[in-house]
Amino acid sequence: MLGTACRSSWNTGNLDFPKTFFFQICRLDGGFLILILSYVASPQCRTIFQVSHSVSASSAPYRLSDALNRHIPGLKSTLLLRRRKKIDGLEIHRTPARRATDALRRHLAHGFDILLPERRKDLPFSLNVLGMGFDTAQMEKADVVHLHWIGGRTVDFSQLRHIRRPLVYTLHDMFACTAGCHCTMDCSLFQDECRGNCPQLGAPRLFRNIPAWLFSRKRRAFGRIPSLTLVTPSLWLKREVERSCMFPGRKIVQIYNPVDTDLFRPAEDRNAIRAGLGIPPGAFVIACGATGLFNPVKGGHFIPLVLEELYRRGHRNLHLLLFGNQEKSVDYPFPSTSAGFITDMNKLAGLYSAADIFLNPTLQDVLSNVALESMACKTPSVTFRTGGVPEAVLDGRTGLVAPQ
């Protein structure tokens, strides 16, 4: 079905990109937190801490923090990360590291793998037991504390009750409402407190109560937080959270992720960008991500299959444009250009513009920022009808959506 969608998108000029769509989806940047503050704090909020495992220039915490600092006079947004990273223009702090507890966490994770040898290693699962500590005094300086991606031992949820400030938790995957998995795929055990045989852990009978214990521990910790508002980037994720019993009685607000349309916009001369990449004139360019190509959630294994099917059906004038670093060598039936790992967002916007379509075969995604970025550059996305992706890709208008 994805190959059919690719063939159907040959004439991308038939796709319509309504201005109202981009206003609603992409122009939220600075206004994002204003909406949140109307639920959890007074309009006088001046200081906010964004807490996350790590960030990059393309991640939601970075974009939000940057937009708030640029667009809201007098408001200061600071990033608090487990892994410190230097990013120009933003104030970044690292959560305090303690050598003894760090070693204990590593041993705990190793013991977890020993107890569960059948656990799927290709899907992330976070215990968040003995997570990184917080400087509570530092947190008291903020008017609002905004949590983002806090898996991977970033925090111990039991510590959150000590933060006496309004907490906003934006869910970027399913982790918050499960025992520890980030992508539920076809599993619905999170609707029943993760009781049963977890398909990701593959636990022997003796340890099959581990997911239920982790779920219960997390729910108790969230229940002790004095002030907590949840934000989901898609209606799909909001409905999934509501199906879980992790957050009874908590306010859940749906707000789409921001995209800077001053940055991600159609290039003035896409032919010059193509020439610089060595792409022959007149080629039909299919762009896709190469990083994590064989991650089962990203669905990258469909890309060679789609290309082989297109070749079998007689399409020859195709050129593949790959973003990111490819972990494994793959033989494609068409010429390809690898742009490598991209850190310059202006360059990324140019690559989106150079493509005729963006192939995004994700099997579960909250919203798909890459789809929003490519569409902001007026490059349609071809994707599956899964998760919150259909909320971003309007089938037949800003892209094509294939049944999964």
Can you annotate each of these PLM segments?
Residues 358-359, 382:
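A short hydrophobic beta-strand element within the catalytic core of glycosyltransferases
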Residues 363:
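Aromatic "clamp/platform" in nucleotide-sugar-dependent glycosyltransferases that forms part
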Residues 317, 324-349:
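Nucleotide-activated donor-binding/catalytic signature segment of Leloir-type glycosyltransferases, i.e.
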Residues 162, 175, 190-231, 239, ...:
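Membrane-proximal helix-turn-helix segments that form the acceptor-binding/catalytic region
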Residues 279-298, 304-307:
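Conserved donor-binding/catalytic core segment of Leloir-type glycosyltransferases
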Residues 350-355:
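Short alpha-helical donor nucleotide-sugar binding micro-motif in glycosyltransferases
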Residues 380-383, 393, 401:
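Short hydrophobic beta-strand element within catalytic cores of glycosyltransferases
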Residues 236, 258:
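Carbohydrate-associated surface elements
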